[in-house]
Amino acid sequence: MLGDSRDLFRPKTSDIPAKPGVYKWRDGEGRVIYVGKAKNLRNRLTNYFQPLYLLHPRTQTMVLTARSLEWTVVATELESLTLEYTWIKEFDPRFNVQFRDDKTYPYLAVSTGERIPRVWVTRSRKRRDTRYFGPYAKVWELRHSLDRLLRTFPVRTCTTNVFHKAQLTGRPCLFASIGKCSAPCVNRIEADEHRRLCEQLVGVMTGRLGRPYIAQLTRDMKEASAELEFEKAARLRDQIQMLETVVQQNAVVFDQDVDADVFGFASDELEASVHAFYVRAGSIRGERNWSVERVEDIDDADLMADLLVQVYSDAAGDNHPQSAATISTNREAIGSTQTITATDAVARAQATRERNTRQETTGRADLLAPIAPVPREIIVPVEPARREELEGWLTNLRGGAVTIRVASRGDKKQLMDRANENASQALQRSKMSRISDMGARTQAMNDVAKALGLAEAPLRIECYDISNTVGGAFQVASMVVFEDAIAKKSEYRRFAIRGKDGKGAVDDLSALYETLTRRFKHGNIAGDSGESIDAEQRVASAAGKMTTAVAAETIAANGNDNGEGGSDISGKGHAVPVGVQNDARESPPDIVQQNTNRHHFAYKPNLVVVDGGKPQVMAAAKALEDCGVNDVAVCGLAKRLEEVWVPDDDYPIILKRQSEGMYLLQRVRDESHRFAITYHRQQRRKGALRSALDEIPGIGESYQKRLLNHFGSVKAMREASVEDFEKVKGIGHAKAEALYTALHEQ
């Protein structure tokens, strides 16, 4: 691992206030690389200075890149929420969670503020006094719907310049000639009548006038047919068919007074995806999807809170730029206090009250009033952190009450489940979009080959990482395999580091050397012919126990806690598959024997990647040299600056951060780190359990494994009763009492 640069700017714990606030990390050039908020700054910031192995991989990269830390004290959590989002928008920090769209979504816009309103398709929501419908998933569907609506409601679609030109020349545009515009520019229709057409179009889009209007057209068609006006009847029939299609696309799914945004959520360790349905007046008016990379070890509740802040800050800012949050700051040294005025919603609330008064006076809703970006109700699958503060903030934005809740039953629960399913599918698409793209994968491998000076693209890449606690306890290593730039989890391996004396390696470099030595002395590495081992040769006896020369345990190919395949590699150079007894257990421990059953190691990698800089690369190169392997390239990816190191070079190779090659190396490195730290935590948990159980008579290794699988931790066992212990297979009353007594004495 690289040196810990956090000591250069670590503040005293007593200097950090135990108050709500927002903090900024800056790099060596003064750029803000991360903005965060905290209910208690002291508790939150001290977490960043705990041992590196306890931090999320991306958090490790962030704190090692940082060179200074600043914080700002605020009065309430709501103010920290506002200030954090404002700073994220201002500084665009590279390590912040940013929910991103995979595309720009189209909207149907109606310019309600103009004397002669117009309708058009747009991908922006920044105009005031404009009503927007959407977002829609496909722009061609929206344009098709608008084309059908214009045949029934021929309203203006031209820009202001085109409209004024037609007024001056007295000649309308082509749409007027084909019946898709009523030509208010040349006074073929009065302004009030044209506005009523716009209201009817909006009424169909909102679902308020769709079915009643179709029913009226149907009656008119029948009357025209009865009076033998067949051309009029045919025209009305076509209008009905076109409107039916539009109305079906905006089918009512709830009562007409329901205004809600329904969110779905899906996530894994590295990424999260969110899908939203927008329900207005009881109908689904649009949908949208976001995805985000997990920058640090943040839970789903905090992710959902961040999403709501970003979504509704953007929406409110687009529709009400004059009411954006105002922040007055006194930027001073570290720890400076800043005065904050939260989002000002007075103008927005006043507009809402005026609209409500106008509706009460006229006795009908103002169909052309801009739609509220914040609905009355927000349905989420996970209750967001700081829910009450968010509700208060959203209430100010909307100018009316807003509730956030998790739907438990009914139609809203069904729609939320549908949103969850869409989010899950989007997450899978996002994960596979780059790795499944043959062009991107080929480009990534070619970028790496060009940067490292390889003769051909590295079709098989193996990456190694070391994980341990302070002092070297529970040293483990991971090996992940990527073939054609795709993770091949069935060939992942995990190593328990023993060292020369069986007590572990003296440092990470020795552990890395041991790992690579053991890996490359397995199988047919020397003079590999590339031929796979026959399946019959891979079958071995499952009887008997492993001896002490072999690993303490084996993991089933699909039985580890992550669902990945692979096995543990432990002891003096032996890779142990499931149910295979080591035939070489009588051999002297210093002799590493070839194991022809190790078909997983029968293929050499084209490239070995290690997590670290020049020292780690030199250790890896030395291991390969000692194993007689001279045709495998080696490189290291250093976390802090994402520099690529190769053996015997004094300077690193710099790959473009946005290149496919860098993305591939980062993904390989991060996957290796994740796999290593997961195994390390598992070993620590087992070690803690065994240390507590070793002194209990009659409780050997097999019983310890059963207890671990049943209870999960020593803490849970200390809270268990004698009857709980008896539920474990093979634990009788006497052993249960012995366990209960021993654990409570400890």
Curated annotation (Swiss-Prot):
Its main location: cytoplasm. One of its GO terms (cellular component) is excinuclease repair complex. The keyword RNA-binding does not apply. Residues 557-577 are annotated as: Disordered. GO terms for molecular function: DNA binding; excinuclease ABC activity. Residues 211-246 form the UVR domain. SUPFAM superfamilies: C-terminal UvrC-binding domain of UvrB, GIY-YIG endonuclease, RuvA domain 2-like. Interacts with UvrB in an incision complex. Belongs to the UvrC family. The UvrABC repair system catalyzes the recognition and processing of DNA lesions. UvrC both incises the 5' and 3' sides of the lesion. The N-terminal half is responsible for the 3' incision and the C-terminal half is responsible for the 5' incision. This is UvrABC system protein C. It comes from Bifidobacterium longum (strain DJO10A). The lineage of its organism: Bacteria, Bacillati, Actinomycetota, Actinomycetes, Bifidobacteriales. The gene is uvrC.
